[in-house]
Amino acid sequence: MTNLRKTHPLMKIINSSFIDLPAPSNISSWWNFGSLLGICLIIQILTGLFLAMHYTSDTMTAFSSVTHICRDVNYGWLIRYLHANGASMFFICLFLHVGRGLYYGSYMYLETWNIGVLLLFAVMATAFMGYVLPWGQMSFWGATVITNLLSAIPYIGSDLVEWIWGGFSVDKATLTRFFAFHFILPFIIAALAGVHLLFLHETGSNNPSGLCSDADKIPFHPYYTIKDILGVLLLILVLTSLVLFSPDLLGDPDNYTLANPLNTPPHIKPEWYFLFAYAILRSIPNKLGGVLALVLSILVLAVVPFLHTSKQRSMMFRPFSQCLFWILVADLLTLTWIGGQPVEHPFIIIGQLASILYFLLILVIMPITSLFENNLLKW
């Protein structure tokens, strides 16, 4: 009798994706983040579902409903902080996953990479709208400032902003629609993640060497299932430690104050995972220019495959490109730090220099260095 997992219409899909999938024998722990992102998404959808059961998307009661969840609902505080810090873990895994893709040349799988960029935008949009829902000071002013950026779009800008707000300011209509979108988007993200995997399994995984691994494949189960379980346990350890010991470490104290349209917080800033893009936005004095730079800071990832000039796929054997990659990482950390600082000297000039370096590295310096490395090998 043939094995059921190989014949059953549903089970054979799972089998070919997670059990009998031929995987390269040398993929490192940097390849764990895909499964970790899947776990993060599941955690976010489940905790979000339970939060939505008690949350009310009305400006009068949103803040108190979140307080009610934390005080009166059984383990409501745990669900709320798992959801809030789960978002941070999600973004940590996302950034490491994208960084892995850049380092090892995984972006050469064009369809997979482009769906990934789309996923990044979708997750960022979801996180932004989720941050507005508790209706604290930073929720309200963050929503006001970020949505207002769309008014920089010529001709249709101001109409577009009022259309998104559902009125002349961020109010009840805005909160209700943000809740609706925040609820539906994770399911769209899950569907996109399925497409992401579909395209990945068309080509098979890349590996650290960047070389073709067709001659040396091993089954996904048990080797990488066990490896992924270790990653998941470590993720849960970090997440639960964060939630149970310092749940507010990554949050903003201003969000414990009810939203007040008449009182602007001294420093409006988004969650830590948006600070690098926020720093790029602020580094340009022109409003439209800042918005374009903000979008391009993520969209530039879609251009990376077309700027690949090296004859080797991975950076494993390219020391100069490796140095530039780690300079890029340091630059992004600098931008993240700058995004959380007030707009004053010397932070303004540091932010501007870091923003210029960010785009220069990706668009100019790294492709030229790759050409230089080709010549170095006399290829």
Swiss-Prot record:
A ubiquinone binds at residue 201. Its cofactor is heme b. The chain crosses the membrane at residues 33-53, 77-98, 113-133, 178-198, 226-246, 288-308, 320-340, 347-367. Heme 1 (or BL or b562) is low-potential and absorbs at about 562 nm, and heme 2 (or BH or b566) is high-potential and absorbs at about 566 nm. Pfam families: Cytochrom_B_C, Cytochrome_B. The keyword Transit peptide does not apply. Belongs to the cytochrome b family. Coiled coil: none annotated. It comes from Sorex shinto (Shinto shrew). Component of the ubiquinol-cytochrome c reductase complex (complex III or cytochrome b-c1 complex) that is part of the mitochondrial respiratory chain. The b-c1 complex mediates electron transfer from ubiquinol to cytochrome c. Contributes to the generation of a proton gradient across the mitochondrial membrane that is then used for ATP synthesis. The cytochrome bc1 complex contains 11 subunits: 3 respiratory subunits (MT-CYB, CYC1 and UQCRFS1), 2 core proteins (UQCRC1 and UQCRC2) and 6 low-molecular weight proteins (UQCRH/QCR6, UQCRB/QCR7, UQCRQ/QCR8, UQCR10/QCR9, UQCR11/QCR10 and a cleavage product of UQCRFS1). This cytochrome bc1 complex then forms a dimer. PANTHER family: CYTOCHROME B (PTHR19271:SF16). This is Cytochrome b. Binds 2 heme b groups non-covalently. Keywords: Electron transport, Heme, Iron, Membrane, Metal-binding, Mitochondrion, Mitochondrion inner membrane, Respiratory chain, Transmembrane, Transmembrane helix, Transport, Ubiquinone. Heme b b566 binds at residues 97, 196. Heme b b562 binds at residues 83, 182. It is a multi-pass membrane protein. One of its GO terms (molecular function) is ubiquinol-cytochrome-c reductase activity. GO terms for cellular component: mitochondrial inner membrane; respiratory chain complex III. InterPro entries: Cyt_b/b6_C, Cyt_b/b6_C_sf, Cyt_b/b6_N, Cytb/b6-like_sf, Cytochrome_b, Cytochrome_b_C_euk/bac, Cytochrome_b_N_euk/bac, Di-haem_cyt_TM. The gene is MT-CYB. One of its GO terms (biological process) is mitochondrial electron transport, ubiquinol to cytochrome c. Its main location: mitochondrion. The keyword Transport applies. It is found in: Mitochondrion inner membrane.
